[in-house]
Amino acid sequence: MTFFLSFLILLCQFFIGFGLLVRCKFVEDSPKILTAGLSLILGMGISCFGVFVEELLRIPLTLTSVLAVNVILVLIALFPFASTIEALKNFFSSPLKGVKPYGFVTLCLVLFFMFISGWLSYYSPVLSVDAIAGPDLVAKYAVEQGTMASSVFYDLEGNLSNQPFYAPYITIMQIQFRLAGNPFGQVWIPIMALAFIAVLYSKMRSQTHGAIAGLLTVLFIMIPEMFFYTTSLLTDYSNAVFFGCSVMIVMDYVRTKENKYLILASILMGFACFTRIDTIVLAGLGILSTGLYMISKKEEPFPLPKALISMSGMFLVSFLFFFLWNVLYISAYLPVKPTAEEQLYVTLFDFGKVMKNISEINEKLVFDTIYFAYSIPIFFVWVLVNAAIKRSFQPLLLLLWILSIYVGFVIILGLFPAAVIDWTIKRGFFKFFALFYLFIASTQLSKWLDAKITSWEAR
């Protein structure tokens, strides 16, 4: 029964996301692997937000009510049914292209690593101290008492860390899968990771040869610290998934000027801000950089009013998700709340402190391979070689997002007392790597290699 209920929740989440993609006319011109991965990721976010609305309405969180809200969301997403059912038929019935040998190798390696993640997630208890004292603790009480605003905040008043207050997404996912009967709840994490790998591979494959995209995908999976978090109940991997997908889709918006991409990118960035409180800083900087790029790019720049309206709208959606949990819910629903002094302090204007933080970030994370192996050196070398040989820094928008994230981390260290380089920023670096490898796949150097490999294959 546990397997059936878990599968049912995941199936509902897939259909919720698929329905939204159909409504946005995304499915008809997108690769199946991209549609599948993005459907599940979007559906997970929307499903959690639906349960959150249930909590706001003070409806008890039970297995029946959680399944009901998922089914209702499926019906809303699939309506009108005729067009969505037709899209589903095309999605499942159209023949897939034959898998090339390099594609088969990539697939086997991905499934091997994800099998390890799935096995560990199912059989291992929640091990992270932050999760045990935070989202998983809140989820356990919510399953027993039917609300996230449970007696955990009374029973442990005065002994709570900041962990129970800042992770709504993974808390709600834990509630859903614990209600389904999973003893540790966290089986959804490697499934979300697999969906993200599918999205990233598809995006890279659209830019370069399948062998190159496959190699970059395997390098992405093998990042040591990041792979561990496909089995660990913390906000950071989920946050990187929503954030990375949003950046990939907003690039499609800038390229095509089609509003469907703006809508999807805004929703995904909203979920990223719903996942971690500090993401609003990174979102703001990245959206600002995107707006400046839109009006200043050489080819078909956006009119200033259109760029201003679209990027303001994207930021407002992000802020709304941030506001609903961090301001509305914590203030109006929780019996205990962190004080402003505990959440914020400002050292941004302490130049010595800022330079010390930058130095430590570079020393501990950028120039050390212990956590992320050689992903960062590979990225830097590729950027320099591409610039030297091809005289290009394109896609420049991706570089602007990468720079915005880095600057954002410096700001976060100057705003949040709980933010530390060894944990907060180290895990925040997860947001870099999908963008790193997508940039590599999108460079002129990769396209040149693509042409060489294709020419060799044609012999």
Question: For each predicted feature, which ranges?
Answer:
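Membrane-interface alpha helices of multi-pass inner-membrane proteins
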Residues: Y261-I277, L288
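Membrane-lumen/periplasm interface segments of specific transmembrane helices
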Residues: S117, S124, L292-S296, L304-N386, ...
